[in-house]
Amino acid sequence: MPLSNAQLAQTIDHTLLAPDASDAQIRELCRQAAEHRFYSVCVNSANVPLAARELADTGVLVCAVVGFPLGAGLSAAKAFEATVAIAAGAGEIDMVINIGALKSGRADDVKADIDAVHRACGAVPLKVILETGLLTDDEKVRVCEMCRDLGVAFVKTSTGFGHGGATLADVALMRRTVGPVLGVKASGGVRDRAAALAMIEAGATRLGTSSGVAIVTDQDGSASAY
């Protein structure tokens, strides 16, 4: 059965992560999210307080990114950023893994990094960004297995700032690895309705995109950055 606009909107994290995002742009992001009933807005942690105020009593969550976009910070710093973002009003956290540690064969350190943020989140859902464009398929599977074992809420393809974005093949691989329990978030390059529906068909249950309005109104979102 085809997804309704309302159902499709509830898969979307309406996203603005540009370093120069202004208060006015964050307010407009929130206005659009409330109008179209998106699941959340996804913003940098410094913008969480403003977004939380704008979205109070709308039912739209605020999602904050942590260790973004490189994932190369200390685990304690990532955990602290998650803690203060949640205190400021974030209802979900998207963290970036330590990609360098993974490439160096330090899988235990990667898992410990994820676990530190997961513990800091408590009951707040955590999405773990793999940055799939930088990983081999074996590395993608390894991180997805870690996330499954730790019981995080979602695995996520990309930051949208690195090499490449979400691909159907990566979404399908991630879904096969984590099974039906974890969510899979496709982010980076999902800019129109056809791409969104294809990602969902491949196994995505959440979409990170700055083209949410174009997707639910079936317009061209190619001018969007994320």
From Swiss-Prot:
Family annotation (CDD domains): DeoC
Query: Could you tell me where this protein is found in the cell?
Result: Cytoplasm
One record GO biological process: deoxyribonucleotide catabolic process
The answer, when asked if Lyase is one of the entry's keywords, is yes
Keywords per UniProt: Cytoplasm, Lyase, Schiff base
Q: What is its EC number?
A: 4.1.2.4
| GO MF terms, alphabetically ordered | deoxyribose-phosphate aldolase activity
* GO (cellular component) term, any one: cytoplasm
Q: List the catalytic residues.
A: 94, 156, 185
The pathway it acts in is: Carbohydrate degradation; 2-deoxy-D-ribose 1-phosphate degradation; D-glyceraldehyde 3-phosphate and acetaldehyde from 2-deoxy-alpha-D-ribose 1-phosphate: step 2/2
Pfam families in the record = DeoC
- Which reaction(s) does its UniProt entry say it catalyses? 2-deoxy-D-ribose 5-phosphate = D-glyceraldehyde 3-phosphate + acetaldehyde
Q: Which domain of life is it from?
A: Bacteria
Keyword Cytoplasm included in the entry's annotation: yes
Enzyme type, top EC level = lyase
| Function in brief | Catalyzes a reversible aldol reaction between acetaldehyde and D-glyceraldehyde 3-phosphate to generate 2-deoxy-D-ribose 5-phosphate.
Family under the similarity heading: Belongs to the DeoC/FbaB aldolase family. DeoC type 1 subfamily.
For this entry, the protein name equals Deoxyribose-phosphate aldolase
Q: Which organism is it from?
A: Burkholderia lata (strain ATCC 17760 / DSM 23089 / LMG 22485 / NCIMB 9086 / R18194 / 383)
Gene coding for it: deoC
